[in-house]
Amino acid sequence: MKNRLACSAVGLVALFAASSIMIAQTSQPRRNGGQSSATGQSSIAPASPGGEIEGTGNQMPRYKYPAAPGPAPKQDLSGEWGGPLSAPRIDPVPPLTAWGQAQFAAHKSNQRISVANSNDPLDTCDPLGFPRNALWESRGIAFAKMPDKVVELFQYQRVWREIWTDGRALPKNIDSDLPDSADSRYYGYSVGHWDGDYNFVVDTAGLDEDTWLDNAGHPHSSELRVNESYKRVDQHTMEMTVTLNDPKVYTKPWMAGQTTYKWIPQQQFDEQLCVPSHMQDYMKLIAKPSAGAAGK
C-alpha cells in the first residue's frame, strides 16, 4: 500500500506537507480545480494549430492529439474525458428559504471553521453523492453506452451512476409512505435522452438530503431536480451544463455549472480515492491538535 502513515521524522515531515495541501484545498470551493475569473466566466484554453490542448485548471493535463478533431460521432459520449478544461461558469446561488437557511447553518463547512470541527462528509470519506461529485469534486468522467442505459463513471472515488434511456419515468414520491415511494439515494435516479444527435440530456431526482451540494455546505432537499446537458461539440470536446431546481431550499432554479471536457487520448485515469484510515490519522495527528492550539 502506498502513502502509509509513518512515525519516523521523514514520515512526519511528509504528513505535515500533505496536511498543508489538504488545508489549502479546503479553504475555498474546489470547483473542478480551476480558478474563477472576476466576472465568473470560464476561460477556455483554445487548441493550437497542432492539436495541443492545455487547460487552466489543475486537473487538466496537457494533451497532444495527432490531428485536429473530426466531427462528433452521433449520439455517443463513450470513452474517458479529462477536465474540466477551466473553471466553470456558474450563476450566483439564489436566496435560501427558511428551511434552507436552517440546513445551511447546521452544515459546518471547513471554509468557516477548522477541519477538526467540520461535519463535511468529505472529511470522513463518506459518499459525496450527486451532484457534488460531478460539480465540485470533478476530475475525469467516463461514459459507457449500453442498450438500455448509459453508465457514467467518476474518477474521484471510483464511483458510477446509471442513466436509464429505456423510456422509464423518474420516481414521483421520494421517502414517503405511499405504496410507490422510492428511497432517496446518494446518486439518485437518472433518466436520459438525446436532443438531436449531439446533446445528451439527463434528469435526476431522489437525492439523499445528507449530501451537500458543494464544499461550502449548501444544502438540498429530496425535492431537488437536476438537469444536465452534455453537448458533443466535436470529436475531442464536450460541454456540460448543470441546472438545479429545489423549491424547498432555494427561491428559484439556478445554473450551477457550465464547463468543458476534453477526450483523453490515452483513455486511462489515475486512481483517486479518499481513504478513511488515512483521514483518521490526519485528524488525530494534525487537524485536532492544530485546532486545539488555535483555540477553535
Where are these regions (language model features)?
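Classic N-terminal secretory signal peptides
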Residues: G11-F16
